[in-house]
Amino acid sequence: LPFTGREEDDQTKTIEFASSHYDLFVEVVGIPAVGKRAGSLPVLEICGVSPCTDFENRACGEATDYLLETTYESDKKLLTARANIMRHMNHRDVNVCLRQASGEELLAEINLADFLAANPMIDCSKQEVLIPIRIEFKAGAIKVTVPEWYVEQVKPEF
């Protein structure tokens, strides 16, 4: 429901409330030869995102990069991160980057606009949006997809 408030005595402004963020989930599978010591795992970053939105839900502020908090499941060789990022108008400016622990060597970079164009089942026009990204290292190649758990196979019964 819209909230109506007085801007001045003779004016009323209606503001529609809507979700101001996207949920981002990144999983990295088959990380190449990570060391056994702490701090040797690759790091995930989300680059070029808006740091805030104004009261009318418009992205604002200077584009910012965030280092994501990750969890590593050694038995599955699975690195995951979950974050909320502000809604932004231009997906082209946003990248998900996977770097060596030192932060110097870039292992993978995924442009959000390209990823969303290749995966139209992710609908960023909805109120609650989950953007799931799977980065898989396999046989010397890197494959970027939507995780299988996100794609729901529907078989209608007639």
Predicted regions, residues:
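A short, Gly/Thr-enriched small/hydrophobic beta-strand-prone motif that recurs across taxa
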Residues: 18-32
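Solvent-exposed, conformationally flexible loop/turn segments
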Residues: 6-10, 115-119, 126
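Intrinsic-disorder/low-complexity, polar/charged segments enriched in Ser/Thr/Lys/Arg/Asp/Glu/Gln
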Residues: 10-12, 23-25, 78-80
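Hydrophobic beta-strand residues in large extracellular and virion-surface proteins
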Residues: 15, 26, 44, 96-98, ...
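Short, low-hydrophobicity acidic/polar segments
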Residues: 1-20
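Compact mixed alphabeta submodule
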Residues: 11, 32-33
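Hydrophobic, glycine-enriched assembly/anchoring segments
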Residues: 124-158
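Tryptophan-paired
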Residues: 36-120, 158
